[in-house]
A protein has these predicted regions:
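The beta1-alpha1 cofactor-binding region of Rossmann-like NAD(H)/NADP(H)-dependent oxidoreductases
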Residues: 53-57, 77-89, 123
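Catalytic loop of short-chain dehydrogenase/reductase
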Residues: 109-110, 120-124, 155-201, 213
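Conserved glycine-rich Rossmann-like NAD(P)H-binding loop of the short-chain dehydrogenase/reductase
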Residues: 26-61
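Conserved mid-core segment of classical short-chain dehydrogenase/reductases
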Residues: 48, 52-60, 110-127, 168-173, ...
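Conserved glycine-rich cofactor-binding loop
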Residues: 12-13, 36
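C-terminal helical subdomain
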Residues: 201, 208, 224-274
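A short, exposed helix-loop element centered on a Lys and neighboring polar residues
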Residues: 141-142, 193
Length: 274
């Protein structure tokens, strides 16, 4: 029996890594991408100002955990700000596995501009945010969706944000959020209804998932402590991974296909009682 193949961006840590391991456990082989191939590498991840301190997690560590679950794993270094590397990763996955059954656009731009006020954010930063959060996912859809359509099945799942659909409670530097990042995620949300109507009855499912507040390595590195995270009732990455797997696999998930955004913590509670 052929194993399905999932293509996951931002799989070196957090939700991406948890989803990779969960899908491996349920019989998927994996093409996983991120900037960080090995532990200890340095990449930009500061939302307010530049921060290149190494973060825990890497493609190699995710692959080790997924292989322990029986998966074949292809690690592909890719930066969503470098669209050539994004295209090369998709081509590499297709060349290696011959197919992709699930595209999980999980990676998002990490860098200055995400949390700036409108009068402070630079246009070059907005360019980066939209390249990483909109253009890169669309490029992957253009690369990987045709094969799903030809087979008559598959799934495209985008990770979005509550900031794209809710008003900020305060300015970006006072506990709220800025304009550029939420608007890019709003664009990503609007991608899915377009795909649904363009490919109705194709056998391919399209979902946008809002993970809730997930306390990630990036947040920790940028100064958000565990006490604040606890106050926001943080969602474990593994719970989001459970939801991603269910949406991609279960026929009952099609009951949610019309919804603009799936709120992962709420759906997880209904499905798994936690």
């Amino acid at each position: 029996m052929n194993r399905k193949v999932a293509f996951i961006t931002g799989a070196s840590r957090g939700i991406g890594a948890a989803t990779a391991v969960q899908l491996a456990r349920f019989g998927y082989d994996l093409a996983i991408t991120a900037r960080t191939m090995s532990e200890g590498e340095s990449h930009e991840h500061g939302s307010w100002q530049s921060n290149t301190a190494p973060l825990p997690g890497s493609l190699e560590s995710t692959a080790e955990r997924a292989r322990a679950e029986g998966a074949q794993v292809l690690c592909l270094r890719s930066d969503i700000l470098d669209l050539d590397s994004v295209a090369a990763a998709a081509d590499g996955a297709l060349a290696h596995f011959g197919r992709v059954d699930l595209l999980f656009n999980n990676a998002c731009y990490q860098g200055p501009g995400n949390m700036q006020r409108v009068l402070d954010v630079e246009l070059a930063q907005i360019d980066n945010i939209y390249r990483g959060n909109v253009q890169a996912p669309v490029l992957l859809v253009q690369k990987l969706l045709p094969g799903m359509l030809a087979r008559g099945n598959g799934a495209v799942i985008n990770m979005v944000s509550g900031s794209a659909i809710n008003d900020p409670p305060a300015p970006a530097d006072e506990g709220g959020w800025g304009f550029a990042y939420p608007s890019s995620k709003a664009a990503l949300i609007r991608l899915m209804p377009a795909l649904r109507v363009e490919h109705a009855d194709s056998g391919v499912r399209f979902f946008s998932v809002e993970p809730g507040f997930v306390y990630t390595e990036v947040m920790r590195a940028n100064g958000l402590d565990e006490k604040i995270a606890a106050r926001f009732n943080a969602t474990p990455p593994e719970h989001v991974a459970d939801v991603i797997r269910w949406l991609a696999e279960d026929d009952a998930a099609l009951e949610h296909h019309h919804r603009a955004v799936i709120f992962a913590p709420q759906l997880h509670g209904k499905l798994f009682g936690e």
